[in-house]
């Protein structure tokens, strides 16, 4: 990568311009949060293939890339036209955000949501291990069934992070309950 430089005798790669080493450890780096945060998004916009995304979807894609730390995932992201407006409308109408993993729920910036938005993640629900075992599935897939049983799924915003079985189960439930 063009942004990497070698530091000191150890040759460890470090980000930034000219690196000064102190026994192989660089002291030339951004040291405060705000500039690091801003530069991260600049790098994403420089390196990711964002041109095919509509204006309302692009910020979501940029956040996904930031979370994954991989600009190449932009080429793997699919979207339905109108998805951003539909999600915003759902949230403004009081829909919850259903998350497969605590990491996803924690990463949601609550200050950017309508005030009473519920963020729901059942992964620590004590019922899940038994439900998953009885159904022969993962806990995250069983959590999707709990969302449906509790009447949460219809109209919700679903955020899937690192549990593909949750995504597959969401698609199955949508097909089973919501598609004619």
Which residue stretches match the model-derived regions?
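Electropositive, gly/pro-rich neighborhoods at or near active sites that engage anionic ligands
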Residues: 23-98
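Gly/Ser/Thr-rich loops at beta-strand to alpha-helix junctions
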Residues: 96-106, 160-167
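Short, solvent-exposed amphipathic alpha-helical segments in soluble enzyme
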Residues: 108-116, 172-178
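Long, charge-dense
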Residues: 112-159
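Glycine-rich phosphate-binding loops that contact phosphosugars or nucleotide phosphates
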Residues: 140, 151-153, 160-178
């Amino acid at each position: 990568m063009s942004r990497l430089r070698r530091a000191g005798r150890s040759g460890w790669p470090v980000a930034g311009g000219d690196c000064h080493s102190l026994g192989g450890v660089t002291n030339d780096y951004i040291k405060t949060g705000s500039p690091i945060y801003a530069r991260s998004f600049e790098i994403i916009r420089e390196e990711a293939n964002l041109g095919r995304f509509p204006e309302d979807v692009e910020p979501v894609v940029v956040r996904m890339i930031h979370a994954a730390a991989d600009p190449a995932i932009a080429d793997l992201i699919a979207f339905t036209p109108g998805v951003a407006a539909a999600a915003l409308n759902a949230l403004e109408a009081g829909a919850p955000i259903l998350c497969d993993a605590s990491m996803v729920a924690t990463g949601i910036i609550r200050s950017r949501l309508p005030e009473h938005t519920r963020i729901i993640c059942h992964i620590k629900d004590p019922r899940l291990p038994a439900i998953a075992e009885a159904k022969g599935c993962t806990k995250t897939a069983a959590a999707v069934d709990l969302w449906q049983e509790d009447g949460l799924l219809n109209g919700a915003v679903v955020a899937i992070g690192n549990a593909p079985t949750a995504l597959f189960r969401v698609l199955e439930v949508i097909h089973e309950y919501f598609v004619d």
